[in-house]
Amino acid sequence: LSKDKREISIKRAEELKEKIADYMDARKKIKTGFDEDVKKRYEKQKKKILAFFNAEEKDWQDWHWQVRRRINEISVLKEFINLDEDEIRAIEEVGQRFRWAVSPYYLSLIDTDDKQDPLYLQSIPTF
């Protein structure tokens, strides 16, 4: 009986491996927070944000500071992200209906050069 269970388990594992084969091939290309270019971009953006708020590392590590400094104005957001007129208009429209804000930390994680960056799409309010 245990041999049958083992064979069933092995067969099921092979089926599951087949289902994720495309992911296993693509995963080497998927950026993570551990990639050097991502770390450098984060540090650069963090430094820019700290300078804007005239803050220090201890502020950055304080969640109260993060909440108090959340960005909810287009004029401040434009200091960190290049927004075209259509994007500004979309943010203004969203802002008329919904409250929005992005914390300094979350902003530092966004690839501001990639408008299709998942964090950009989740954080910057547009239709």
Question: Which residues fall in each region the model found?
Answer:
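Flexible, acidic/Gly-rich N-terminal and inter-domain linker regions that tether
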Residues: 1-127
